[in-house]
C-alpha cells in the first residue's frame, strides 16, 4: 500500500482482509515517452552485441512508475481507496515513442471484521 496516497493496488480481484463495498469502474493512467535519437543510436549499437539495453529498461521502468502514479491519482479523483485487477499494457507509437497504460477497477473497500473472518475460515 502506498502510504502517501493510501490507495491499495493489487493484480487480484480481491484483497485479503477487505471487502468491496462499492465498485466504481475502470480507471487508467497513461503516459507516452519518446526514446529520443540518442537513445535509439546507443540502443542500436548495444543490440549488435546482444544483452540488455539498459537505457530502454530504465525508460520503461520510469514510464511504468509514471503510469502507476497517474492511476493512483485517478483512483483518488473518483473516490476509490483501492484498485483491483491492476494490469499494464504497452504499445509503440511510430518508431520513437512508447505508450504505457496502467489500468484496473476502482473500488471502495473496508476491513472485514474478525467475526466475519472466523466464519469464513470455519
UniProtKB/Swiss-Prot annotation:
Recorded superkingdom: Archaea
UniProt xrefs under Pfam families: YbjQ_1
PANTHER family per record: UPF0145 PROTEIN SCO3412 (PTHR34068:SF2), UPF0145 PROTEIN YBJQ (PTHR34068)
Family assignment from sequence similarity: Belongs to the UPF0145 family.
Protein name from the UniProt record: UPF0145 protein TV0671
Lineage: Archaea, Methanobacteriati, Thermoplasmatota, Thermoplasmata, Thermoplasmatales
Amino acid at each position: 500500500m502506498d502510504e502517501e496516497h493510501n490507495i491499495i493496488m493489487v493484480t487480484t480481484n480481491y484483497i485479503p482482509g477487505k471487502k468491496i463495498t462499492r465498485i466504481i469502474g475502470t480507471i487508467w493512467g497513461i503516459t507516452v515517452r519518446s526514446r529520443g535519437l540518442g537513445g535509439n543510436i546507443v540502443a542500436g549499437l548495444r543490440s549488435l552485441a546482444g544483452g540488455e539495453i539498459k537505457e530502454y529498461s530504465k525508460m520503461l521502468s520510469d514510464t511504468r512508475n509514471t503510469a502507476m502514479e497517474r492511476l493512483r491519482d485517478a483512483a483518488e479523483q473518483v473516490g476509490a481507496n483501492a484498485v483491483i485487477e491492476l494490469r499494464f499494457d504497452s504499445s509503440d507509437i511510430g518508431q520513437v515513442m512508447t505508450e504505457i497504460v496502467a489500468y484496473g477497477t476502482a473500488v471502495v473497500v473496508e476491513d472485514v471484521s474478525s467475526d466475519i473472518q472466523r466464519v469464513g475460515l470455519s
